């Protein structure tokens, strides 16, 4: 089968398309024919081994897992003898951070992994693009216990995580202020934001409004810069480690004291998570944004584009010849 592999760490150019052996499902696995996957920031980080600490999990000198890809959607091609929840022909989607392997024509997935039957109202492209951004957004929203009527600011509202967060927060009844660049103001308003700040013309950290939660979905600000935006017991959330890395450290220290604090939740990857996302897709409370589509043969170009930092929502890799 065809797959995108990397046998060394580095820039997008370390990735190449080659033929590899077809995986075989064990008794407790399903074999999925991939129709769509994505290139996301997790793939970029593991490919480049940045931060360096990732090497302790992926291989100190060279990657142990050569095929990346965390999000997928496709059809079940075969099932192991012990599999009861899925059958051949099922349309499935899921998330496999840690296992990887979705940047290929076929993938084996344990029956109890983060995989579910696709909602009938989404395409393969949409299903593949629905998991990483929304599950990071959900993990943070749940950790902060955000509820109806609260004021929340989302920085990076056009990214995969930020665009999901805006939609999910509105479905909860929160009042959402979103931060994005000029050209995307109408888009973010359509996502449901009550108010939009154009970071090209205004510094959002100088905003006069205060918030119950500031969610830095872009990971480009800091608790220090955003602290003045928080109400007395407000919460700062970030999807990035921050320098040194400060955000996990602050998440350990700040809850020990009264007042404003930092939370840095570690998302759970299980069937409950993907089932929750399925429900959100079915209810139309969430729809992933898709920026560009590339065929597998052009995955290096997809990596380059993602690393410009200019993508909107998600970048999808199509394995069925469709890039429209």
Where are these regions (language model features)?
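Glycine-rich beta-strand-centered segment in the early N-terminal region that forms part
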Residues: 21-38, 52-99
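Glycine-rich phosphate-binding loop and adjacent beta-alpha segment
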Residues: 220-283, 318-324
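A short acidic, Gly/Pro-enriched loop at the edge of an enzyme's catalytic core
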Residues: 205-213
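N-terminal Rossmann-like NAD(P) cofactor-binding module of classical short-chain dehydrogenase/reductase
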Residues: 93, 197, 212-215, 237
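Mid-domain Rossmann-like dinucleotide-binding core that forms the NAD(H)/NADP(H) cofactor-binding site
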Residues: 127-198
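C-terminal hydrophobic helical "lid"/dimerization subdomain
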Residues: 270-324
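Short glycine/proline-centered loop/turn elements that form peptide/ligand docking sites
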Residues: 80-82, 176-187, 220-223, 242-245
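NAD(P)H dinucleotide-binding glycine-rich loop of Rossmann-like/cofactor-binding domains
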Residues: 61, 70-71, 78, 85, ...
């Amino acid at each position: 089968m065809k797959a995108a592999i990397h046998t060394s760490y580095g820039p997008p150019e370390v990735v190449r398309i080659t033929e590899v052996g077809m995986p075989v499902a064990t008794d407790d696995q399903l074999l999925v024919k991939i129709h769509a996957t994505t290139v996301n920031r997790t793939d970029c980080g593991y490919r480049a081994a940045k931060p360096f600490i990732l090497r302790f999990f992926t291989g100190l000198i060279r990657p142990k897992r050569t095929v990346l890809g965390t999000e997928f959607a496709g059809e079940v091609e075969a099932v192991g003898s012990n599999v009861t929840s899925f059958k051949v022909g099922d349309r499935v989607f899921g998330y496999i951070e840690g296992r990887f392997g979705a940047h290929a024509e076929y993938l084996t997935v344990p029956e109890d992994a983060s995989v579910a039957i696709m909602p009938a109202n989404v395409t393969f492209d949409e299903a593949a693009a629905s998991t990483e951004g929304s599950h990071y957004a959900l993990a943070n929203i749940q950790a902060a216990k955000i509820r109806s009527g609260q004021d929340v600011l989302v920085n990076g509202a056009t990214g995969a995580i930020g665009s999901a967060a805006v939609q999910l927060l509105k479905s909860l009844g929160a009042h959402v202020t979103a931060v994005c660049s000029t050209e995307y103001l109408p888009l973010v308003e359509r996502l449901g934001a009550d108010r939009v700040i154009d970071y090209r013309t205004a510094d959002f950290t100088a905003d006069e409004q205060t918030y119950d939660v500031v969610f830095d979905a872009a990971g480009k600000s800091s608790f220090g810069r955003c602290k003045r935006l928080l109400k007395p017991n407000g919460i700062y959330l970030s999807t990035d480690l921050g320098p040194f890395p400060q955000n996990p450290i602050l998440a350990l220290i700040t809850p020990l004291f009264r007042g404003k604090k930092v939370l840095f939740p570690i998302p759970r990857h299980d069937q409950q998570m993907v089932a929750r996302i399925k429900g959100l897709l079915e209810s139309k409370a969430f729809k992933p944004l898709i920026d560009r589509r590339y065929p597998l043969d052009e995955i290096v170009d997809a990596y380059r584009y993602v690393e410009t930092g200019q993508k909107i929502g998600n970048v999808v890799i199509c394995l069925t010849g469709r890039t429209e």
